[in-house]
Amino acid sequence: MDVEKKIELIKKKPTEELLTEENLRHLFEVGIPMQHYIGFEISGYIHLGTGLMAGAKIADLQKAGIKTRIFLADWHSWINDKLGGDLETIQKVALTYFKEGMKQSIKVMGGDPDKVEFVLASEILEKGDYWQTVIDISKNVTLARMMRSITIMGRQMGESIDFAKLIYPAMQVADIFYQGVTIAHAGMDQRKAHVIAIEVAQKLKYHPLEWKGEKLKPVALHHHLLLGLQEPPVWPIESEEQFKELKTQMKMSKSKPYSAVFIHDSPEEIRQKLRKAFCPAREVRYNPVLDWAEYIIFREEPTEFTIHRPAKFGGDVTYTTSEELKRDFAEGKLHPLDLKNAVAEYLIELLKPVREYFEKHPEPLELMREVKITR
């Protein structure tokens, strides 16, 4: 596969931002072995925004011939008070429920879970020279910048935090360089850490990204954050700035179960959640159900998506692109309930292999049900 085809695969949905395409092309051209990574806190049930969005992108990267890695961020989860801040519980969940759930998610999105390397953060954090990299990065970033970056943990600027949380952004950047990562992958909410990585790349003395004597910058790949199903706190949305802010605030959240569909939800749970979803008639700009359709159902276009309706309501209708679907919805030709029902049935079918896996192997999910879920 030539470089341009690889770049097209990397850019396809659900990619929302690539920092930068020019640098990605340069990395391919210099011939450095390409290593992807995406890091996850271990914090609760896996929802579609985690499993399917990351799984879809991992599938694309594999098709482009890139080695893929999932970094199970146990220490980072401990710092950020996940699962009650109990490191032993976090590690147990990471290596059972989370690992198996991500494998199944990758599989349903067309990737090969056996080609994904899973690394527990403890395995590298316990090496002394990792902390040299953390200090090296920290010496090249101001305290004010680190404090602004705590939003990568789902924390607000100005929120009262313990000191450990200020180390977190430097650790996240160190993870990239210590593992020799060329493509750092995350949701759009992790952008601040990745921008720091790009900016400090050529200043580092310990574990820089280097190939044949040249210090290189990693590429940052950010996928779309699926909107949560709940109604936003402010409606209607007046300004573009408000809209951008809301998109990040209203992402799917495991701490708000009705905002999210989890990868192992039952068919009835999926139907109930979609029925309750915020989906105002004719609204296409901020509509979680249309958002899910665009990034899950219409990830590959053209694709056939049929909405079944009684003849008296217009009968069945088939769409091949998300734009066709949005157009009919905006014009009032498609009722919100018909859209919700069709998306629910699509997800039920898509997630069937995941449900079947956890029915045959219930132990990881049972363990997860026993532990405290935090945001």
Curated annotation (Swiss-Prot):
It comes from the Archaea. Keywords: Aminoacyl-tRNA synthetase, ATP-binding, Cytoplasm, Ligase, Nucleotide-binding, Protein biosynthesis. Its main location: cytoplasm. InterPro entries: aa-tRNA-synth_Ic, Rossmann-like_a/b/a_fold, Tyr-tRNA-ligase_4, Tyr-tRNA-ligase_arc/euk-type, Tyr-tRNA_synthase. A motif ('KMSKS' region) lies at residues 251-255. Gene3D superfamilies: HUPs, Tyrosyl-Transfer RNA Synthetase. The keyword Nucleotidyltransferase does not apply. It is found in: Cytoplasm. It catalyses: tRNA(Tyr) + L-tyrosine + ATP = L-tyrosyl-tRNA(Tyr) + AMP + diphosphate + H(+). ATP binds at residue 254. Its EC number is 6.1.1.1. L-tyrosine binds at residues 37, 168, 172, 175, 190. One of its GO terms (biological process) is tyrosyl-tRNA aminoacylation. One of its GO terms (molecular function) is ATP binding. Belongs to the class-I aminoacyl-tRNA synthetase family. TyrS type 4 subfamily. Homodimer. Catalyzes the attachment of tyrosine to tRNA(Tyr) in a two-step reaction: tyrosine is first activated by ATP to form Tyr-AMP and then transferred to the acceptor end of tRNA(Tyr). This is Tyrosine--tRNA ligase. It comes from Thermococcus gammatolerans (strain DSM 15229 / JCM 11827 / EJ3). The gene is tyrS.
